[in-house]
Amino acid sequence: MSFDTSFSYRLTNRFLGPGQSLDVRSDGSCRLKMAPTGDYSGQHWRLVARSGGRYALQTSYLGECFSLDVINDGTNTTPWLAVTGNYSGQYWTLTPWGDGTYRLTNDFTGPQRSLDTYSDTHDPFLDTGDHSGQHWTLTALDRIPGTAPVPELEPGGDVYKTEGPTDFSFYARPSGVVKAAMVFVDFPDAPAGSTSAAATADHLLGNGQAQRLYREQSYGQLSLEVTVRSDLGWRRVPKPSTSYHLSQFESHRSYITDAAALFQPTEIAFSDYQLVFVVAPRAASFPLSPAFNARPGQGAGSPSGEIRLAVTLGSDSYTNRYINLVHEVGHLFGLPDLYSYTGSGAADSKAGCWSIMSDIFHAVSFLGWHRHKNGWLPASRATYIADSTPAWYATLSPLSGSCGLSLLVLPVDDPHHPSKVLAVELAQPVLGSNGRSWGEGVLVYTVDATIATGSSPVVVIPKRASSSPDYGYLYEAPFGVGEVAHTVQGSVSLTMTVLQKFGSSYNVKVDYRR
């Protein structure tokens, strides 16, 4: 027997009749209940086809990240919604009784135990036999809606490193295999001495953590392959390091050109790589590690071709962790600095400690918006709410997961051609200087494509504006269960209430008015 999986279904049984429907408890336990029939998301069940004619059963309430399963406690009779996975308790067979109803069994407890309800408490359980509570009627309800696509933001002019569309004639596309070469140079005024190039590379890349972070944050869509040419040793640039000023485009380009000239095409062909990392000794007069972007024909020269995308690693990379390089590579993919150039950097960034592009000292992930902008977040995991709604409910799943709705986007200005939006997602834990992870709850922020890099294009709306030496600025920004975020942006207001936590997911109510 097959079902139309494009619809959601109501499940009622013969014992309790059509006035009671299978539902989910709202207490965070993920347990089931029989509740008075109504238009509730916990009573909208989705059937997801699996192999052998079996189905996973999920609700609109908790979404695709939670599937009907059985608690493995020895008795194995209690159904609940568990994190979706390849588990035998989530493979359900719907067998016709011959009277228009169905028996629901699963692979874990076998064909002898069917979904039933107790005669006294009416709680669902699994039992043997042929009882009226095991005769389930599936009534088709609404067609399952898709997520509304999130539009690109319109910068409204020439905005450098905008949160709007990325110009891939200028930046690297963050997908597929992106190849990078790392070379090492020193200077008459800053010799490398006995510094190991190989050990330096290990530190800069975090012994492979930088590459792994990009692979995980992109859900496997980006593979950053770094070829470390420590075997070529430290090559001496003729000019002193003080002759270069990396904050100036022409001087920055000259430095990369002079460094690349030290390597013959037979040693390394820079044209084979999309990105180039040029490493200087700690003693060089480069306090920072800026990214270099150039349009075709305006890049640095090399014996084997033009270099348009590079990171020149300075002394801060020796004291900072590998996130420093991850941040700079983010610029090569078109992501902006979220902290203000006129402020104190990460210490007072309006995006707080919640993004690698804001705080390299505590953040270990990219915002959901940047995952979306980079094309990493699947379209089904983000949705756009363009119209006013006094009560819109959703269960948000962690961005680090592989399923579920993870990003809500709401326009602040023109809903059809927005330049500024509100974003709602689950906070991704930061790493404290004490080595401990911190941060859970719901994060709310604005994204403005008309604001350039270094001018706070992302602003977190915090529960509490506080700072910690261990966890960073705005470390108490996320909202927890029972807490309410409220903001007014121009003519738009958003009130977001965190209703409940289910595992690592949060159920929220959105009141959006424009």
Predicted segments, located by residue:
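Structured loops at beta-to-helix junctions and adjacent beta-edge loops in soluble globular domains
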Residues: 14, 60, 107, 183-188, ...
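Zn2+-dependent metallopeptidase catalytic core
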Residues: 145-318, 326, 343, 413, ...
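Non-catalytic C-terminal accessory/binding modules of secreted extracellular proteins
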Residues: 143-163, 193-194, 293-318, 390-514
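Residues that flank catalytic or metal-binding motifs in active/ligand-binding sites
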Residues: 7, 18, 41-43, 64, ...
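Lectin-like carbohydrate-binding module/patch detector with strong preference for beta-trefoil
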Residues: 1-145
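Extracellular hydrolytic enzyme modules, especially secreted metalloproteases
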Residues: 270, 274-277, 282-434
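Residue-level detector of buried hydrophobic side-chain packing
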Residues: 22, 66-68, 115, 182, ...
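Short Gly/aromatic-enriched secondary-structure transition segments
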Residues: 34-35, 195-207, 436-443
